Amino acid sequence: MTSIDFPLLNRRTQNSVISTTPNELSNWSRLSSLWPLLYGTSCCFIEFASLIGSRFDFDRYGLVPRSSPRQADLILTAGTVTMKMAPSLVRLYEQMPEPKYVIAMGACTITGGMFSTDSYSTVRGVDKLLPVDVYLPGCPPKPEAVIDAITKLRKKISREIYADRIRSHRTNRSFTTNHKFQVGRSSHTGNYDQGFLSKPPSISEIPPETFFKYKSQSSVSSHALVN
């Protein structure tokens, strides 16, 4: 028996034994096994899909795209989130097993983007719905930026404690600017109280005597008929 056959015999014990904690071991095992959920609502998802190709090859980071939320532990909200899509997004997040992580990808996801000023159906920030771990700005972000966000998430996972993460999600939430619209009861379905908008009355709302009175005259707007 020589040292060539058994090279570990000449090594010191401190180089052969690893001392760690259960939390560190759990975090280390999750670093290279982040399985993202294939979720996209806008053009940002095209940039994320390009990572699957051989040019960027995100398989080297251990990322395996999954089509089921029950098999995924990472979701990248790529694209605009609307009021009608919000309940489905929350349901997908709730179906993901713990521990789970969220990356807000793109300006439309983070603040509403170009739709944040005059859109009545866009969520101004996905952090109103989900606890976000990493914010990735851009319109849209490049694939290199997505890889950088995943790298930062891996660093965050390596030093986190699972119990503290669950506690922070229940107490601490970060919100963006509130909506400037009056939200009705069914806000998750995109129905807003739009009573302040001017709406011309229909012909059925005009009394018959008023309608026939102005029928022979020149064209009159519906507002004039009511008044």
From Swiss-Prot:
GO annotations under biological process?
aerobic respiration; electron transport coupled proton transport; photosynthesis, light reaction
| EC annotation from Swiss-Prot or TrEMBL | 7.1.1.-
- Does the UniProt entry include the keyword Lyase? no
SUPFAM superfamilies per UniProt: HydA/Nqo6-like
Segments carrying the region annotation (Disordered) are: 173-201
Cofactor(s) needed by this chain: [4Fe-4S] cluster
Q: Which GO terms describe its cellular component?
A: chloroplast thylakoid membrane; respiratory chain complex I
Keywords in alphabetical order, please.
4Fe-4S, Chloroplast, Iron, Iron-sulfur, Membrane, Metal-binding, NAD, NADP, Plastid, Plastoquinone, Quinone, Thylakoid, Translocase, Transport
Cofactor: how and how many bound: Binds 1 [4Fe-4S] cluster.
Which reactions appear under catalytic activity for this entry? a plastoquinone + NADH + (n+1) H(+)(in) = a plastoquinol + NAD(+) + n H(+)(out); a plastoquinone + NADPH + (n+1) H(+)(in) = a plastoquinol + NADP(+) + n H(+)(out)
Task: Give the residues the record marks as binding [4Fe-4S] cluster.
Answer: C43, C44, C108, C139
State whether it acts alone or in a complex, and with which partners, per the record: NDH is composed of at least 16 different subunits, 5 of which are encoded in the nucleus.
Give a short account of what the protein does. Answer: NDH shuttles electrons from NAD(P)H:plastoquinone, via FMN and iron-sulfur (Fe-S) centers, to quinones in the photosynthetic chain and possibly in a chloroplast respiratory chain. The immediate electron acceptor for the enzyme in this species is believed to be plastoquinone. Couples the redox reaction to proton translocation, and thus conserves the redox energy in a proton gradient.
Q: Which family does it belong to?
A: Belongs to the complex I 20 kDa subunit family.
Extract the HAMAP family matched here: NDH1_NuoB
In Swiss-Prot or TrEMBL terms, this protein is called NAD(P)H-quinone oxidoreductase subunit K, chloroplastic
Q: Specify the taxonomic lineage.
A: Eukaryota, Viridiplantae, Streptophyta, Embryophyta, Tracheophyta
